[in-house]
Amino acid sequence: MAFDKLGRFFGIAEDDEMNEAPYTEAEQQEEEVPQAQKNERRANVVSINSGVGATSKIVLYEPRVYSDAKEVAQNLLNNKAVIINFARMDDEQARRIVDFITGTVYALNGEIQRVGDKIFLATPPKFETDGKIAELVEKKDKMD
């Protein structure tokens, strides 16, 4: 039977009639039922380890040269928050590093905030910061 079909496909066979018996409706229905059950089982697979083991880290930096900005950016790419203290740098170099880090934070959809004189906090997108240092100082002054 199969050789006849193959021969007809390539135009070699002499007999153009089909020798197979047609399927009945009962045979066709029996074949379709097991396939539907298999598809339902595949949709029920769920991973349960997705949130296990996640830790957050904050890295402290006190850069002295512009090339230290690359290390800060690498930590942001690794989903670590970074606190940067520019107290030991001149203002021009510090401004260049802040510009570089701001670009990195923008590309990652993170945030950068000034938290003090020459101190900045840069966070990747999974971190959430609340409040401002200036607001906290004002509240403390009102309480005193």
From Swiss-Prot:
Its main location: cytoplasm. Residues 16-42 are annotated as: Disordered. It is found in: Cytoplasm. Transmembrane segments: none annotated. One of its GO terms (cellular component) is cytoplasm. The keyword Phosphoprotein does not apply. InterPro entries: Cell_div_SepF (IPR023052), Cell_div_SepF/SepF-rel (IPR007561), SepF-like_sf (IPR038594). Belongs to the SepF family. Cell division protein that is part of the divisome complex and is recruited early to the Z-ring. Probably stimulates Z-ring formation, perhaps through the cross-linking of FtsZ protofilaments. Its function overlaps with FtsA. This is Cell division protein SepF. It comes from Lactobacillus gasseri (strain ATCC 33323 / DSM 20243 / BCRC 14619 / CIP 102991 / JCM 1131 / KCTC 3163 / NCIMB 11718 / NCTC 13722 / AM63). The gene is sepF.
